[in-house]
Amino acid sequence: MKRFTLIVLVSLFSLSAWSKKKEFPLIGEKAPSFSESSTNGVLNFPEDFGDNWKILFSHPLDFTAVCTSELCGLAYNQEKFDSLGVKIAVVSIDEIDRHLLWKEFMERTMSEDGEAIEIAYPIVADLSGEVSEKYGMLHASANEKRNVRGVFIIDPDNIIQSISFYPINVGRNIDELLRTVAALQLTQKENVLTPYNWQPGDDVLVPHKPYTEDELKENPELKNQYYNKGEFMWYKKMNKSGKK
């Protein structure tokens, strides 16, 4: 009995230690604040971005192929992020001077359709690793001294709405990032859900049947606004050309 009790206590202690070590903010929780140097000066995150949507985007190392492609991808799509009211901050465990050199290199040598790019978003120098630890971006089994590719999408109230981590050898899909932000914004604004492969303008799901038979009799037009597939999948039409 004593041995069993000891095993249980050791297991609970180990679980507690693991939980503490692995702790980072989750969906629905407040985004941790930090103040660090960046390529745009000192950044107080998320406060400096006000009531905008925010993306915290971590990368492993400056002057590497995948990271360069990703940051250029963010720059190529800057206008799309602006149209969604999104502010971006990029972070890695690199010195500020290295960030500045890398930014200058990308703006000087990278282009899209022959036009030079501008890195408008700040690249944060998290040399101490404190920011990366706060957001759980250091995964020891991958590389304990370098960030994995993390993405935190944060709403205007500074609540985390989406979290994703990618391995060091896989670049992220910027179109998917934009799609996720658009979906989060729509579902916060309206009481709707987005189905698989949803794209902006597509029809959306509603949580339950949107009308009763009595309501339909009073307003027959409701039938033209919604349709169902089976008993519990009800769609709302979004007035996109070619859709129901």
Please give the residue ranges for each predicted region:
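Sec-dependent signal peptide recognition
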Residues: K2-V8
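Hydrophobic h-region of N-terminal signal peptides that target proteins for export
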Residues: V10-W18
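Chalcogenol-based redox active-site neighborhoods
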Residues: W18-K244
